[in-house]
Amino acid sequence: ADVVVIGSGAAGLPAAIKAADGGASVIVVETNYDVGGHAIISGGNVPLGGGTSAQKKYGIQDSPDTVFSDLTDWTIVQANGWPDFRYNDREVMRAFADHCALTYEFLLESGVQFKEVPPDNQGGHNLGNSAPRENHAFWTKGAGYESPNNRAGTGVIRPLENSARAKGVKFLL
């Protein structure tokens, strides 16, 4: 393989897909009996903003600069928020903010479906988001392999797995 990806969770699967898109032969190595990591048993809440197509559809104003400000500006912290993340590296936060909307579109292109509801601020702790950014993955019971706890995280992981396999990515479980 040209590329070996360690782990098949919410970071590993997209890495494998992008490498395959670039023409590389890819193998994903996973220590578990199934793909998905912690993401497959998550609630399927995906906090991406910065002007996603979902935000635009529902008239929500957001931008990469606003995402960056929300992640680095201490004056925005809400009373019950977790301020610790504002210690994160500013360059990493800038890169995250600049790629949020592109990441959302990548998930859609990879087959991830989100509930037809406006993004909101549920599914987490009030971190001081000035715009609704929480998207909720959709998964229909019986539509394929599900997580052991039937959580919506499968609505993110299974489409990513299917996309990777369709692009020739091999898995070593």
PLM regions with names:
Residues 1-11, 27:
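Beta1/beta-strand and adjacent pyrophosphate-binding region of the FAD-binding site
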Residues 9, 22, 164-167:
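Extracytoplasmic low-complexity repetitive segments enriched in small/polar residues
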Residues 31-34, 46, 51, 119:
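Short, ordered loop/turn segments at secondary-structure junctions
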Residues 21-42:
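Glycine-rich FAD pyrophosphate-binding loop
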Residues 92-173:
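Conserved redox-cofactor binding core of oxidoreductases
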